[in-house]
Amino acid sequence: MAELQEVQITEEKPLLPGQTPEAAKEAELAARILLDQGQTHSVETPYGSVTFTVYGTPKPKRPAILTYHDVGLNYKSCFQPLFQFEDMQEIIQNFVRVHVDAPGMEEGAPVFPLGYQYPSLDQLADMIPCVLQYLNFSTIIGVGVGAGAYILARYALNHPDTVEGLVLINIDPNAKGWMDWAAHKLTGLTSSIPEMILGHLFSQEELSGNSELIQKYRNIITHAPNLDNIELYWNSYNNRRDLNFERGGDITLRCPVMLVVGDQAPHEDAVVECNSKLDPTQTSFLKMADSGGQPQLTQPGKLTEAFKYFLQGMGYMASSCMTRLSRSRTASLTSAASVDGNRSRSRTLSQSSESGTLSSGPPGHTMEVSC
């Protein structure tokens, strides 16, 4: 038998000529993220079943990022533009993500039977421990929008030791007053449920402009096969209790918080009021110009930038690279840090619309983004 010989084959034309190892690593990461479709689970709770989707693998000594969406949306329609944004990939490779869908909001969800008692927002918050127990996760960083922001804030009040930080977009911590109820009832006589929800999600200026984004979400909500379920979630949101935040009082969020709202957004006044009631040493307030009612959809780059600095202020991603947004400017970053255990807990963001300089300022500072 002839002796086998080893033959070496060299590639005459590399597939990616001139590609650096760093670029190859980034391309591999992007492909891995693209192929990661997440694992969807359901767990029974005292208030019914809840569905959630997990992306990535748990990282030692790091919390999970847990999201909760607003009324009329699910986790994909609420958060995909943000978490698929290019600069966000540096964050999500460092944290496992849990995207919770409110009951009946997940894709393909059956319509609840007539007379079904939908959970209150407080009860939806009480479902989260069942999710974390199922996954064996001990702590989270919560990211919520609208009703989801309220739910995560309520959860943080009930379980402060399990929440390391909160990003609350468009939160309204107040129960509806009599005037709100009267306006809501009057609107209900002349507007459909989809139109009322769109008015909750977007500003009147956006709705009048009828951009492609508005057309897309109007179509999603109007033709949702689970519209009856959406109405139940909407009713629970409108029946929410007051969170009773009080600056300097016993009822407050005890973790770092970043409040986010768009300039002229439907919930701008509510978020401003919420900011006035929280601990200024723990709270950052990000008001985003030209972002409308859903900044995570319209300005994912700017929100990613702020989120990255928020995580750095908590002691994570200290070696994080600057994003394109900050590289395009003269950027300076300083920290005023107070140590809680081994972790820096006190950093707040500010941005000057005139100088375009990013910096960290004293706690309780407002960050207005108009770029």
Swiss-Prot record:
List of residues that carry Phosphothreonine: 20, 330, 334, 348, 357
Residue list for modification N-acetylalanine: 2
GO biological process annotation, one example: cell differentiation
Top-level taxon: Eukaryota
Tissue: Highly expressed in brain, heart, skeletal muscle and salivary gland, and moderately in kidney and liver. Expressed in dendritic cells, but not in other blood cells. Expression levels are low in pancreatic and liver cancer tissues; absent in meningioma. Expressed in low-grade gliomas but present at low levels in glioblastoma. Isoform 1 and isoform 2 are present in brain neurons and up-regulated in Alzheimer disease (at protein level).
Residue ranges, compositional bias (Low complexity): 347-361
Subcellular location(s) of the protein: Cytoplasm; Cytoplasm, Perinuclear region; Cell projection, Growth cone
Cystine connections: none
Cellular-component GO terms for this entry: cytoplasm; cytosol; extracellular exosome; Golgi apparatus; growth cone; nucleus; perinuclear region of cytoplasm
Cell membrane listed as a keyword: no
Modified residues (Phosphoserine): 326, 328, 332, 335, 338, 344, 350, 352-353, 355, 370
Annotated region described as Disordered, given as residue ranges: 1-21, 334-371
SUPFAM superfamilies: alpha/beta-Hydrolases
Alphabetical UniProt keywords: Acetylation, Cell projection, Cytoplasm, Developmental protein, Differentiation, Neurogenesis, Phosphoprotein, Tumor suppressor, Wnt signaling pathway
Matching InterPro entries: AB_hydrolase_fold (IPR029058), NDRG (IPR004142)
PANTHER family: N-MYC DOWNSTREAM REGULATED
Family to which the UniProt record says this protein belongs: Belongs to the NDRG family.
Function, as annotated: Contributes to the regulation of the Wnt signaling pathway. Down-regulates CTNNB1-mediated transcriptional activation of target genes, such as CCND1, and may thereby act as tumor suppressor. May be involved in dendritic cell and neuron differentiation.
Subunit structure: Interacts with CTNNB1.
The protein's name: Protein NDRG2
Gene that encodes it: NDRG2
